[in-house]
Amino acid sequence: MNNIPQVKVGIVAVSRDCFPESLSVNRRKALIDAYTKKFGATEIYECPVCIVESEIHMVQALEDVKNAGCNALVVYLGNFGPEISETLLAKHFDGPVMFCAAAEESAEDLMDGRGDAYCGMLNASYNLKLRNVKVYIPEYPVGTADECADMIHEFMPIARTIIGLKSLKIISFGPRPLNFLACNAPIKPLYDLGVEIEENSELDLFEAFNKHEGDPRIPKVVEDMEKELGKGNMKPEILPKLAQYEITLLDWVEDHRGYREYV
């Protein structure tokens, strides 16, 4: 049972039109190279579209990362960046989003090599707040290619958690039957997180358990339990019942998964 989300992060560079687009593109390539050398390339995707103060570019980048199967996004300011289109990208992307920006490489080239991405991050964060768009911004979001690669790697478990919660169903058993949520305010915080919860009666679980008596899968599960317990197997006589219970729960998960990916 696959119950852990696989994250694929699309990395989109953005550029303001009063700065060279090549500055953002080259810095994006350096970032991709740095991440690949440190962590491999399986979890990232380099979007070829550089957004240059254009809502059309934003739509093109959005479609590109969607078609590439990305479920998380990094908006990378290679220079000051276009506040409108970069924040629109974050608004319309259906998944966790991170913002980071490129530090200046050198003080020797302040004509074509200066990006002012630090200032761009300040403006981007303000515009995101104006739009009520929530994204992840590292504590120090401006850095070299290596430093931004580390930031993206730190974003991975955050993205995985958000993706998982949005597609998670919690199944529980208690005194209430299914579809009887009256007087159950404690589940509201789960709804606020985007988590679905299905409460079932313990009597339903007991009935399902009894229906699994003599299930042909029980001996194999018992054998696996014996291997796991080793010398700690002090009560082997209860293992068949535990195996029956495990199979009951696994079948329940598959039968009650509904439209959720993770249970």
Locate the predicted segments by residue.
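Metallocofactor- and cofactor-centric catalytic cores in central/energy metabolism, strongly enriched
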Residues: 1-163, 167-171, 176-260
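Conserved metal-phosphate-binding beta-hairpin within the catalytic cores
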Residues: 263
